């Protein structure tokens, strides 16, 4: 029956037995008893003492085993935490992969739908113009919810912006009429036509008929027509167009004078 008890309980029972035997020996020492009874009590005490020592050795072994088990439990807890971290990482990866697969399936479905029902680029451009005419993609930095202004710049704000000012500076810049700004071939053509039209004039000198035919103003070119002095405004959109027009006018004037 003692085998079903724990080591602690068995040790406590042995201590109780040794205590009872010791009390019996002390009581019998004051009384006259036979030597055989005394020897039996002593033998029983020695047997209980040996059993108690064996139980102590067993308890020490069990304590060592318990210490090893505690170390193993600590290692198990460490590995358990690592496993939990890995499990969490796997769950996150599973969530990301499932989301990516879902989005990929949606994209494949949209691609298949687009292949079945293609849309021309003209319709896309029309749709983009329709969106741009009614909506916008950005708002001013100071705009907030409840602001009465539109969340996109107006035409006046666009003209007052940096792009509008830069365009005004380009279109409204001062244009000077210099021979150095013309290509060398056109300068030679203009000089040759002027020399042939002057006749008796000095070589290389521009005649009076060709002087003051071009008046250059800001962003505008005026050409004098004949002796009447009427001027016609010409657009100065590109420097090449102005140079070609000046060369053609010089050639026509020289042919008229001849």
Curated annotation (Swiss-Prot):
It holds the Pfam family Med4. The keyword Transcription regulation applies. Residues 52-101 form a coiled coil. Residues 164-208, 234-258 are annotated as: Disordered. It comes from the Eukaryota. The keyword Transcription applies. Residues 166-190 have a biased composition (Polar residues). One of its GO terms (biological process) is regulation of transcription by RNA polymerase II. Residues 246-258 have a biased composition (Low complexity). It is found in: Nucleus. GO terms for cellular component: core mediator complex; mediator complex; nucleus. Its main location: nucleus. GO terms for molecular function: transcription coregulator activity. Residues 194-204 have a biased composition (Gly residues). Keywords: Activator, Coiled coil, Nucleus, Transcription, Transcription regulation. Belongs to the Mediator complex subunit 4 family. Component of the Mediator complex, a coactivator involved in the regulated transcription of nearly all RNA polymerase II-dependent genes. Mediator functions as a bridge to convey information from gene-specific regulatory proteins to the basal RNA polymerase II transcription machinery. Mediator is recruited to promoters by direct interactions with regulatory proteins and serves as a scaffold for the assembly of a functional preinitiation complex with RNA polymerase II and the general transcription factors. Required for activated transcription of the MtnA, MtnB and MtnD genes. Component of the Mediator complex, which includes at least MED4, MED6, MED14, MED17, MED18, MED20, MED21, MED23, MED24, MED27, MED30 and MED31. Interacts with MED10 and MED21. This is Mediator of RNA polymerase II transcription subunit 4. It comes from Drosophila melanogaster. The lineage of its organism: Eukaryota, Metazoa, Ecdysozoa, Arthropoda, Hexapoda. The gene is MED4.
């Amino acid at each position: 029956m003692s085998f079903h008890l724990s080591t602690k309980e068995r040790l406590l029972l042995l201590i109780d037995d040794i205590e009872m035997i010791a009390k019996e020996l002390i009581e019998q020492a004051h009384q006259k008893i036979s030597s055989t009874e005394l020897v039996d009590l002593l033998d029983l005490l020695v047997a209980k003492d040996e059993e108690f020592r064996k139980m102590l050795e067993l308890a020490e072994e069990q304590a060592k085993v318990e210490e090893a088990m505690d170390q193993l439990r600590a290692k198990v807890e460490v590995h358990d935490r690592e496993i939990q971290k890995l499990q969490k990482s796997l769950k996150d990866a599973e969530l990301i992969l499932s989301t990516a697969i879902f989005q990929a399936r949606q994209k494949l479905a949209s691609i298949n739908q687009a292949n079945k029902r293609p849309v021309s680029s003209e319709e896309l451009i029309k749709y983009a113009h329709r969106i741009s005419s009614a909506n916008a993609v950005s708002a001013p930095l100071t705009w907030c919810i409840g602001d009465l202004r539109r969340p996109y710049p107006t035409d006046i704000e666009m003209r007052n912006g940096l792009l509008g000012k830069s365009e005004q500076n380009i279109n409204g810049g001062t244009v000077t009429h210099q021979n150095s700004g013309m290509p060398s071939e056109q300068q030679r053509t203009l000089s040759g036509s002027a020399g042939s039209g002057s006749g008796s004039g000095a070589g290389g000198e521009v005649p009076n008929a060709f002087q003051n035919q071009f008046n250059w103003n800001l962003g505008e070119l005026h050409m004098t027509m004949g002796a009447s002095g009427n001027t016609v405004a010409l657009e100065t959109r590109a420097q090449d167009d102005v140079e070609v027009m000046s060369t053609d006018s010089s050639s026509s004037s020289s042919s008229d004078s001849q």
